[in-house]
């Protein structure tokens, strides 16, 4: 089947009446990618693969899960993945569907299209996490083909984890990532903001200066802060003034407290406590092969965050990261989402690879 993106729309989603819905809008499916890079996932990827299977199993309670799997690993995936997960042959360079997959936009008639952003492995030659991302660049088009959705080729390097929207005109992001010179150095802040308006149909952008400390994505918003519902956000928080995260969280809180969303509302801010601090062990670091990917070092601070959860069809799938704080996070999430199923999945193996549950998933909002 010829790619719908072979001749992408020359207009923009906003011109055509399309907008990115909030994550709590209904989903037809959630996509994931099989983790296989032995220079990123320890012990030949086996612990991560088992963890991805548990995440898929949790999501599949309410939402169909589709997983892209390189052909050479299909037999392995069939042994590990739950039978109700649809496995689709798809090449990739790593397993971060949030960042390489398409951003789906809908119009008032319920039609579905997708945005294929440019991708450079979180920084290209200036801090990118691996050297060759040519397969990753093809992922979004393949997902759109699967759903027979037409697409827009956006003239912007952007990962899905760097944006959150409330579905009512407001976008959250971080300057640390979106204005990083290793992403779109030729574009000004004003030009990037205009592209956000053109492609996502938002009107108000709330800029946090930084994301989570030592986040190798250059501070993705989806690890730091997200919308709970219109007018409410969850923020990664620590009360420890000696922690390098403290100043980042306080600065974000001040911005959010002063902000007004696209509808003129003040924001209610939920503080989600940081786990840990968490660090990679010697055993964990030694289990990763040397290769093209960024080196995994024993003792390195892990950017663990409970904000890195997925909202899908009245369910929250969140990472279990620290026995001391997991229950606190669960209770807070249940308060934030009183009518939702709250599903925790042990997720340290994902964190060791550089992200978490939101980073490895990408929702396909329901078309009417």
UniProtKB/Swiss-Prot annotation:
InterPro entries from the UniProt entry: Agmatine_deiminase (IPR017754), Peptidyl-Arg-deiminase_porph (IPR007466)
Cysteines engaged in disulfide bonds, as pairs: none
UniProt organism field: Pectobacterium atrosepticum (strain SCRI 1043 / ATCC BAA-672) (Erwinia carotovora subsp. atroseptica)
HAMAP family membership: Agmatine_deimin
Keyword field contains Nucleotide-binding: no
Keywords: Hydrolase
Gene3D superfamilies linked: L-arginine/glycine Amidinotransferase, Chain A (3.75.10.10)
Gene: aguA
Record's protein name: Putative agmatine deiminase
GO BP annotations listed: putrescine biosynthetic process
Signal sequence annotation: none
Catalyzed chemical reaction(s): agmatine + H2O = N-carbamoylputrescine + NH4(+)
GO terms of molecular function: agmatine deiminase activity; protein-arginine deiminase activity
Family, similarity comment: Belongs to the agmatine deiminase family.
Active site: residue positions: 359 (amidino-cysteine intermediate)
EC number assigned by the record: 3.5.3.12
């Amino acid at each position: 089947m010829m790619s719908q993106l072979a001749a992408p729309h020359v207009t923009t989603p906003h011109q055509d009446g399309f907008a990115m819905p909030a994550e709590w809008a209904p989903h037809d499916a959630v996509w994931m990618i099989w983790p296989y890079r032995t220079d990123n996932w320890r012990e030949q990827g086996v612990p991560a693969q088992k963890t991805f299977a548990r995440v898929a199993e949790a999501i599949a309670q309410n939402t169909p899960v589709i997983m892209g799997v390189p052909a050479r690993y299909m037999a392995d995936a069939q042994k590990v993945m739950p039978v109700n997960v649809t496995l689709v042959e798809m090449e990739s360079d790593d397993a971060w569907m949030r960042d390489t997959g398409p951003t789906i936009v809908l119009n008032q008639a319920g039609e579905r299209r997708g945005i294929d952003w440019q991708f450079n492995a979180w920084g290209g030659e200036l801090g990118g996490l691996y050297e060759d991302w040519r397969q990753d660049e093809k992922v979004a088009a393949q997902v759109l083909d699967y759903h027979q959705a037409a697409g827009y080729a956006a003239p912007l390097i952007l990962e899905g984890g760097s944006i959150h929207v409330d579905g009512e005109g407001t976008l959250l992001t971080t300057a640390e990532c979106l204005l990083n010179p290793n992403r779109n150095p030729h574009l000004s802040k004003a030009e990037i903001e205009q592209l956000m308006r053109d492609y996502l149909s938002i009107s108000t952008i709330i800029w946090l200066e930084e994301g989570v400390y030592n986040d190798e994505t250059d501070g993705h918003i989806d690890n730091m802060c997200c919308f709970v519902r219109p007018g409410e956000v969850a923020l990664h928080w620590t009360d420890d003034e000696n922690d390098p995260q403290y100043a980042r969280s306080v600065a974000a809180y001040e911005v959010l407290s002063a902000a007004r969303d696209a509808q003129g509302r003040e924001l209610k801010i939920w503080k989600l406590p940081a786990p840990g601090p968490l660090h990679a062990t010697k055993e964990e670091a030694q289990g990763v092969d040397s290769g093209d990917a960024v080196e995994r070092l024993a003792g390195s601070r892990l950017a663990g965050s409970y904000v890195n959860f997925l909202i899908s069809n009245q369910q929250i799938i969140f990472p279990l990261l620290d026995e001391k704080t997991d229950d606190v996070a669960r209770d807070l999430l249940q308060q934030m989402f009183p009518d939702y199923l709250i599903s925790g999945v042990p997720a340290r193996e994902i964190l060791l690879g550089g992200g978490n549950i939101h980073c490895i998933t990408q929702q396909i909002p329901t078309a009417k």
